[in-house]
């Protein structure tokens, strides 16, 4: 069967930049699905996207479906012919329905019954006949939240469609897609090459468009932007900040990228750089430049869609546009400094945190009380912790945060520095919200750690205290994410404290606001402990490792983490699988037999294998116990791994359930001693493989 290269392009008005890549990928997936369902083989489907077009190149696709044979089942052979071998009325009716003669009949075996059938040859449909509907279905299935219809069209799409190209090699496939007749004419850059571009062959698409100032390949266009941005940054000894989502959006805004470096007045560098970066990235789609120390430089890079003969005009135009935005940020910053942070608490008394839990000032005072209590655990200075807690939410009333909500905490840090607060206090204001997401950095200061922990605990315990715990997909206070943050703050700062102790401290700050302390405590502790799985699964830890540790129900997150790391390491040892299986066998034996308490009686050890295992246990126990006391669980399990050989020998050569009651009881005690050594770390019997 012959193979062809197909090109499909849908030309539109400018597509939504934040959706362009998603639309391209979805079109590719849906088209591949349609081709597969139609039984059309192909080598690959390449997808392209630019602001005014979505396109596909289908390589080496079949010219048509393969011919097939369809079976139509008739009556059983026994009922199809009479005693003389002539067709019965049942068979005649079947033949009439199919429009066939006796000579065209076949038979097949259906279980124990032989039946008559008609095998009809079905010729496969051509690519030309199938492809238009495959593409239209793919377009209909694109993830478009809101479709629009142009005045001249009955069909809907994310933006009005202007043209359609559908080529099979050098031939146009006759089709109407999105109410537009397909052809071989596309269009170049809106300004550089607005005239029609006739495609002689499907393979000419990318090259023909590049001659018309359109880079249709998204990845190539993006790589060009990255190269140009880096070159411009290198020229001023700086590094560009290039967030992935911003790069995707800028790539989706231009057909012919031309990066240009512009400047802004150095006086704006006195404004918190986070505010400047936010406004330039979010509002203007600029790439900001920083030096080796991470300090913002007075430059930005804009990506134009035009290769101008006078790029200075474009640069100056962007500088003129950005100046008012930077001036606004500067104004807010200067205005805020007229009112000290501490004096803003009055405004917090009018800002509701949660109807039943009070205002943001109520929350601040609770956090302050809790932070002082936590200081003995985190090692923070209690006075610093209290002051930082009382100032923590004050910047929420500032003009700067009102304009740039993502600067909450960060703005407070700047204002606290200006007011002369010490580093622990000022940095804690920005660090209180860390970590913001999975894998985010943690606070660097002890005071920041204390406030971050206190803030999350206050919210979690308070929300549980009023009976509004997360349910299903509803988690308005982001308590699931907050709980993982609490666990990380404890574990990564090596805080030796139990979850229940922390919850109790938070409950003390609430007093009578929370009516049922016992239920709140139990629910909050269970919720936090339930987040271990999400935390460790994000790190790639296997579920059975968690189950092995959870079987012991450690109270301290730090202790839990050490055990998880130990079991994770244990799984990599060559002895692990055999020891896990042996532990499972031991656990099953001991579960059925109650008489396993007490010490092993050495005189009742009669088999060499049980004597050897006892000797090994006697030797390893004084080595392992200090490691357990020091919570060096990894080393403890590594030492216990040496027991594999004597354990294997024991089960190979010793009958645990001996007829002699004393021997049986002694062997059960020996196994219990072995089991207890392992379960001092985790229940390794639950490990798989």
Swiss-Prot record:
Reaction(s) catalysed by this chain's protein: tRNA(Gly) + glycine + ATP = glycyl-tRNA(Gly) + AMP + diphosphate
SUPFAM superfamilies reported for this sequence: HD-domain/PDEase-like (SSF109604)
Pfam families linked: DALR_1, tRNA_synt_2f
GO function term, MF aspect, one: ATP binding
Keywords from the named record: Aminoacyl-tRNA synthetase, ATP-binding, Cytoplasm, Ligase, Nucleotide-binding, Protein biosynthesis
GO cellular component: cytosol
InterPro entries associated with the record: DALR_anticod-bd, Gly-tRNA-synth_bsu, Gly-tRNA-synth_heterodimer
Keyword Nucleotide-binding assigned: yes
EC number: 6.1.1.14
Compartmental location: Cytoplasm
One of the protein's GO biological processes: glycyl-tRNA aminoacylation
NCBIfam families: glyS (TIGR00211)
Family to which this protein belongs: Belongs to the class-II aminoacyl-tRNA synthetase family.
Subunit note: Tetramer of two alpha and two beta subunits.
Protein name according to UniProt: Glycine--tRNA ligase beta subunit
């Amino acid at each position: 069967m012959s193979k062809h290269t197909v090109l499909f392009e849908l030309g539109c008005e400018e597509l939504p930049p934040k959706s362009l890549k998603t639309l391209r990928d979805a079109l590719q997936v849906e088209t591949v699905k349609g081709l597969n369902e139609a039984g059309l083989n192909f080598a690959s489907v390449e997808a392209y996207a630019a602001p005014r077009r979505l396109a596909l190149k289908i390589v080496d696709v079949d010219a048509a479906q393969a011919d097939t044979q369809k079976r139509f089942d008739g009556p059983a052979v026994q009922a199809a012919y009479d005693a003389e071998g002539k067709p019965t009325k049942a068979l005649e009716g079947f033949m009439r329905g199919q429009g066939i003669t006796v000579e065209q009949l076949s038979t097949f075996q259906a279980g124990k019954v032989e039946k008559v059938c008609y095998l009809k040859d079905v010729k496969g449909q051509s690519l030309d006949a199938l492809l238009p509907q495959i593409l239209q279905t793919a377009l209909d299935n694109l993830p478009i939240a809101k479709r629009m219809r142009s005045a001249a069209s009955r069909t809907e799409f994310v933006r009005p469609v202007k043209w359609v190209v559908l080529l099979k090699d050098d031939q146009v496939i006759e089709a109407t897609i999105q109410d537009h007749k397909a052809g071989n004419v596309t269009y170049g850059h809106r300004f550089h090459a607005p005239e029609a571009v006739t495609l002689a062959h499907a393979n000419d698409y990318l090259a023909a468009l590049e001659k018309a100032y359109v880079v249709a390949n998204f990845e190539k266009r993006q790589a060009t932007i990255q190269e140009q941005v880096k070159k411009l940054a290198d020229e001023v000894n700086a590094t560009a900040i290039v967030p992935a989502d911003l790069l995707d959006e800028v790539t989706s805004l231009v057909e012919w990228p031309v990066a240009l470096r512009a400047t802004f007045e150095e006086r704006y560098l006195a404004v918190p750089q986070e505010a400047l970066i936010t406004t330039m990235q979010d509002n203007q789609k600029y790439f900001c430049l920083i030096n080796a120390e991470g300090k913002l430089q007075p430059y930005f890079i804009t990506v134009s869609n035009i290769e101008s003969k006078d790029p200075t005009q474009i640069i100056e135009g962007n500088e003129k546009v950005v100046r008012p935005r930077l001036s606004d940020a500067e104004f807010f910053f200067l205005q805020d400094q007229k009112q000290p942070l501490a004096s803003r608490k009055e405004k917090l008394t009018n800002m509701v945190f949660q109807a039943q839990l009070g205002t943001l000032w109520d929350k601040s005072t609770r956090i302050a009380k809790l932070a002082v209590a936590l200081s003995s655990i985190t090692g923070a200075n209690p006075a610093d912790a209290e002051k930082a807690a009382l100032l923590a939410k004050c910047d929420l009333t500032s003009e700067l945060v009102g304009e740039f909500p993502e600067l909450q905490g960060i703005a407070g840090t700047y204002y606290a520095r200006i007011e002369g607060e010490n580093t622990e206090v000022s940095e804690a204001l920005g660090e209180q919200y860390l970590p913001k997401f999975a894998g985010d950095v943690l606070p660097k200061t002890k005071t920041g750690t204390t406030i971050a922990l206190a803030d999350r605990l206050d919210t979690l315990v308070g929300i549980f205290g009023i009976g509004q715990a997360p349910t299903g997909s509803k988690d308005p206070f982001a308590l699931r994410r907050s709980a993982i943050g609490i666990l990380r703050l404890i574990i990564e700062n090596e805080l030796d404290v139990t979850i229940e102790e922390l919850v109790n401290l938070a409950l003390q700050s609430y007093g009578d606001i929370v009516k049922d302390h016992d239920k709140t405590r139990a629910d909050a502790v269970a919720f936090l402990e339930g987040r271990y799985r999400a935390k460790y699964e994000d790190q790639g830890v296997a579920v059975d490792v968690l189950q092995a540790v959870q079987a012991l129900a450690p109270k301290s997150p730090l202790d839990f983490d050490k055990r998880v790391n130990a079991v994770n390491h244990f799984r990599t040892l060559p002895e692990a699988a055999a020891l896990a299986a042996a532990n499972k066998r031991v656990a099953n034996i001991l579960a059925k037999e109650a008489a396993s308490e007490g010490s092993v009686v050495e005189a009742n050890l009669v088999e060499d294998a049980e004597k050897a295992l006892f000797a090994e246990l006697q030797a390893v126990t004084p080595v392992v116990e200090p490691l357990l006391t020091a919570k060096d669980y990894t080393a403890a399990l590594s030492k216990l791994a040496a027991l594999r050989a004597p354990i294997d020998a024991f089960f190979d050569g010793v009958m645990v359930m001996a007829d002699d009651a004393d021997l049986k009881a002694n062997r059960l005690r020996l196994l219990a001693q072995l089991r207890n050594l392992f379960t001092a770390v985790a229940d390794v019997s639950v490990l798989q493989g």
